[in-house]
A protein has these predicted regions:
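A long amphipathic alpha-helix within ATP-dependent nucleotide-binding catalytic cores
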Residues: 585-616
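Active-site loop/lid in soluble adenylation, ligation, and acyl-transfer enzymes
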Residues: 437-439, 445-564, 674-675, 679
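C-terminal helix-cap and adjacent tail motif
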Residues: 553, 636-680
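Glycine-rich anion/phosphate-binding loop at the beta-strand->alpha-helix junction
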Residues: 155, 159, 203-296, 301
């Protein structure tokens, strides 16, 4: 970073821009090609000579140009043709700011990787969570690291956005009108430098870009400060749950030999204040006079190199802090006991409400004992000795409330949402099974509103609910191949219901309400979108045929594509641009469809793999209910998924029927049996 912001590198960027501008003029026939070759061969500069000239001119760009012209000779007259100083200075500054962010982002990637490792390492290390500085309820140290990981992912997105915003150049003259320069010169130079030409400018690029950049740096620095402050609090003598490493020979105080202070975290806290202050200065730079004044220049010469250098330093130092961080689980356990059971007060409150007390009554009862426990003794003992609570809860029920484990049941789910682990499908399976055997909701089957190849849909007595009946008919090739296969409807209904319930545990909204029978389910009424979403993990089916590739080739990442639902047109593929142009969905809805589909893929792929099944690809359908909520609809079954045995590669899906690979039901039955815990 120091080299990046050196005068040598800055002037080198200026020279590069001047030479590229000459090349562009030569292509336009305004400068002899031989002159450009001479300039490229001879052009150089000397820092001391530039400083000498600037002493006289009081203008750094003129001093630079004079120095370069001296090295070139007569051909130096073509340098800076049609340009103004900030055509060069601003474009070069954009390059430097872009390159600085690349250095910062590289360091940030290392920190993110380390945070991921720390989060997983301490995922189950229980400690007390604190609100307002006061003990609240149990969490884990890994959750803190996971929180920081997600926050820095957002920081990375902001910094990437800032890099995009600042990766812009301008060579448009004194007031941005190209009065003495051809726009081609700007386009040529920017293309060679990997920048985009500004859509419009004055004598300078507009400073909202630089302000956004500095604010992205400041927010990132503030996040690092937040993490450092947390470590400082956790290192306080009264807490001492973590500690900065303390090197051999290091001293903490000139007067007190025992001191081990969190000095690096304190340093980061202070530096973040500097970066924040610089961001404010960048905001002040936005309001320039007319087509430009120079008030921003002196500010930027300080705040931009300083802020990028400081943030890079902060990231590197915080990475070192994490690498050497001392963690004390025994102290965490001791601190959990400090409040003598008060941290379980909410569990007691909810248990009393479940037993029939009004919430306000239960709250007052628990609070009375909690306030008594602070000065007097053990909260659990007070609870057990209270006759009113004893009339609702037994001693065993009370003891069960004073347990850390329920607070941590969803840590795996949080880690999955944070992108730190696979979805915890094993924990969701029991919930999904409960959904399948929960009390059936029913609506009187009334008018048949739709019959397709695989299902019938009926209105019910409730206008917001439909009843879906799964048929035994199997079809392929747009109905050219048909067969009644007893038991197919039952298996597709049960498998779909189970997978809908599983996905709902992962936060995916579906139309599924409940099973009505082994071949029927109750669903929410929706307006179905005319799109099918296809998610592929491996090359297979139509993709293999279209590309002439063998089936089974794994894709480097899941591929999402879309089809227009039309039997007559054989469900043609649609590009995302076509979907938006045809207004089939809005851009935001399209983004949501992709995100939900990829989420489904992550859950289903992990789930099926745990059952010895490979999820090759699958199709999904979506719709909106009357409240405008986007729901996953239709079915998720071997009819709509390609499912292969993980070890043998045996196809367990509808391809058995399409390609005459064996009995359809036996394949579907294997899938259902494995989902139920059998070998299949």
């Amino acid at each position: 970073m120091k080299e990046l912001w050196s005068p040598q590198n800055r002037y080198q960027k200026w020279l590069e821009i001047e030479i590229l501008a000459c090349e562009a003029w030569a292509e336009l026939g305004k400068i002899p090609a031989s002159a450009v070759e001479t300039i490229k061969k001879k052009a150089s500069f000397d820092l001391q000579r530039i400083a000498e000239i600037e002493e006289v001119t009081k203008h750094d760009v003129i001093a630079f140009l004079s120095c370069v012209a001296e090295s070139v000779g007569d051909e130096g007259k073509f340098l800076h043709m049609g340009l103004t100083s900030y055509d060069v200075v601003d474009t070069a500054l954009s390059l430097l700011m872009r390159d600085a962010l690349e250095i910062i982002l590289e360091a940030l990637e290392k920190l993110l990787k380390l945070l991921q490792e720390k989060a997983l390492a301490y995922k189950d290390t229980v400690m007390i969570g604190r609100t307002h500085g006061v003990h609240a309820e149990p969490i884990t140290l890994g959750l803190k690291f996971a929180l920081w990981y997600c926050e820095l992912q957002r920081a990375r997105q902001r910094l990437e956005r800032a890099k995009e915003v600042i990766s812009v150049g301008r060579l448009s003259g004194a007031v941005g009108t190209y009065a003495h320069i051809d726009p081609y010169v700007e386009a040529y130079v920017c293309r060679k430098l990997g920048l985009k030409p500004a859509k419009i400018s004055t004598q300078v690029l507009q400073r909202d870009r630089h302000a956004e950049y500095l604010n992205a740096l400041a927010v990132t620095a503030a996040s690092l400060e937040k993490f450092a402050v947390e470590i400082r609090h956790l290192q306080r003598t009264e807490v001492l749950e973590v500690e900065e490493s303390f090197a051999q020979g290091q001293k903490g105080s000139s007067a007190m030999p025992h001191k081990r202070n969190p000095i690096t975290c304190e340093r980061l806290t202070g530096l973040a204040r500097v970066v924040r202050g610089n961001a404010l200065a960048a905001l002040e730079n936005i309001a320039l006079w007319h087509e430009r004044d120079i008030s921003h220049s002196s500010v930027e010469r300080i705040i931009i190199p300083d802020s990028t250098t400081l943030l890079h330093y902060m990231i590197v130092k915080f990475t070192e802090i994490l690498q050497g961080l001392q963690v004390y689980p025994a102290r965490m356990e001791k601190n959990l006991q400090l409040t003598k059971g008060l941290i379980f007060s909410q569990r007691l409150l909810l248990a009393l409400v479940e037993k029939g007390l009004l919430r306000e009554e239960a709250y007052a009862l628990v609070q009375r004992l909690a306030l008594q426990a602070w000065p007097e003794g053990d909260f659990r003992d007070l609870v057990k000795g209270d006759p009113e609570i004893g009339s609702y809860l037994s001693a065993a029920e009370i003891d069960a409330l004073f347990d850390y484990r329920p607070y941590l049941e969803n840590v795996d789910y949080i880690f999955w949402k944070a992108g730190l682990s696979d979805p915890p499908v094993a924990k969701w399976e029991q919930k999904a099974r409960v959904r399948l055997v929960s009390p059936k909701r029913s609506g009187e089957k009334r008018e048949l509103v739709y019959e397709g190849k695989a299902k019938k849909v009926y209105k019910t007595s409730d206008p917001d609910l439909y009843l879906v009946e799964f048929k035994d008919q199997a079809t392929a090739f747009d109905g050219m191949k048909k067969e009644e296969i007893p038991g197919k409807g039952r298996l597709n209904n049960l498998i779909s219901a189970y997978l809908f319930a599983l996905l709902e545990c992962a936060g995916v909204a579906t139309h599924f309400v409940s099973l009505v029978s082994e071949t029927e389910m109750l669903v929410r009424a929706v307006e179905v979108l005319p799109l099918e979403v296809i998610v592929r993990n491996l090359v297979a089916g139509s993709m293999a045929k279209r590309l002439g590739m063998p089936e089974g080739r794994e894709l480097s990442r899941p591929l999402v594509s879309f089809c227009y639902k039309s039997d007559q047109l054989h469900d043609p593929l649609l590009t995302e641009e076509e979907i938006i142009a045809l207004e089939l969905v809005t851009p935001d809805q399209l983004t949501a469809l992709k995100e939900i589909s990829l989420k489904c893929n992550q859950v289903l792929r992990t789930y099926f793999q745990s059952k010895g099944i490979l999820l090759v690809d699958f199709k999904l359908e979506f719709g909106f209910d009357h409240q405008g909520e986007l729901l996953l609809v239709d079915e998720i079954s071997p009819d709509t998924c390609r499912l292969w045995d993980l070890e043998t590669g045996e196809k367990l899906d509808k391809d058995r029927f399409r390609r005459d690979l064996g009995d359809l039901i036996s394949g579907y039955q294997k899938v259902w049996q494995r989902m139920q815990g059998g070998e299949g």
